[in-house]
Amino acid sequence: MSANRFGHRVVEGAIRNISSDSNVNAEIKAEYYSATGTLIGTEVDIVRRLGPGKTGAFEVVYSGEQRWDIKYYKIVNLQEI
């Protein structure tokens, strides 16, 4: 997890389409937590039109007021949409 130039918390990564389906759309959901384990917020990113065997980058951004309290995150869902 990093912070962008606005101080928003950013989770970056990549996913790969391991199926033979073309133009797969995927949703990545991340939950952001405080040091005490309190859920601060949930955000999503969508990777669109991912062809067979192709890799796509994602960036899940939390820009809420409590962004400075975030200490860790969990990717809680990765699904085709």
Predicted regions and their residues:
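Short proline/glycine- and polar residue-rich coil/turn motifs
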Residues: 48-56
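Terminal connector regions
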Residues: 42, 59-81
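Transition segment at domain starts
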Residues: 1-8, 62
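Exposed aromatic-hydrophobic patches
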Residues: 12-13, 55-63
